[in-house]
Amino acid sequence: MATPLVRKPAVPSRTARAGAGPAPPRRVSLSLLLPALCAVLLVSLVCGAGIGASGLSWSEVLRCLWAGLTGGRIAPDQVPAYTIVWELRFPRAVLAAVVGAGLSAIGVAVQAMVRNALADPFVLGISSGAAVGANAVLIFGAFGTLGIWALSTASFLSALLAMMLVYAIARTARGLTPLRLVLTGTAMYYGFSAVTTFMVFAAERGEAARSAMMWMLGSLGGADWASVPIAAGAVLGGLAHLAWSARRLNALAMGDETAAALGVDAGRLRKELFLVSAAVTGAVVAVSGAIGFVGLMVPHAVRMLVGADHRRLLAVAPLVGAVLLIWVDILSRVVLAPAELPVGVLTAVIGVPCFVLLMRRRSYTFGGA
């Protein structure tokens, strides 16, 4: 009986394998990445409290942090160190983490909302609207009766007014469309920026104009414990809503028709995302100024690590953004000590080359492939 011939499967040639395209990149396991990022965040917070021009020892820094966290007593000779660590540096590090987390998460949401790889939290024009209120306080003394709350209150109120204006112009009978949102937000950005620039040039030269310019470039120099709860509450609320909407974000990122086929109301979801993004951006910008590039760069970098699934993106991006902004703020304090650089300047200096390197990678696409 003849033995049947079994044809061996052909082995693809090297040329054929090369022409098949790059293999999909490996994704980092969240079970390893999340604990590592949490540990790095804690270390970064301690470093943010310990690094500065005053030259405190690490034992003093840890002692002051422990006293502040537990409510313990400190020796009279340690009061200056305690003031520096607990009242000045540590709230600043915490606020940097909150702002970085908020900008990164909203960057992910806005890019999905408008399906544009160049979108960031400021594309909606909210930050430039907040700058109008901030400059009114810094230059002209508006809301002076509110004391320390004047700057954040005026910034947040003007951000809300900007949000309402953008929404009113961009909205149509079909709801909010990505193109109208981007175009309206961009137009409002330039319009509000022109107003703030005019306010700075109309002001008398001096400390007020300098403070306004620092705020417009982003600064955490005015951070204190009073400014943390409002920003943290807005960011945590926004993160909770985005995490709950992660599956719908995956559908929206594939297009309105695909989202509708999957049972997702794209118009309603886009409206929710707009309101959440505007509220979080307004709260964050009110306490930190306009810190750019974090909400643009971090989402793209995280996509390369964990892919385009928004459930993974929204778990990792806030932690990466928090760590990034803590260390950028540390650099802003020590590069030209005792002078201080605007945080937004350093985020651009660091972000531009990093972003260019990301875009140079052949395997990277906006969808995370």
Feature roles, as predicted:
Residues 2-369:
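Alpha-helical transmembrane segments in inner-membrane proteins
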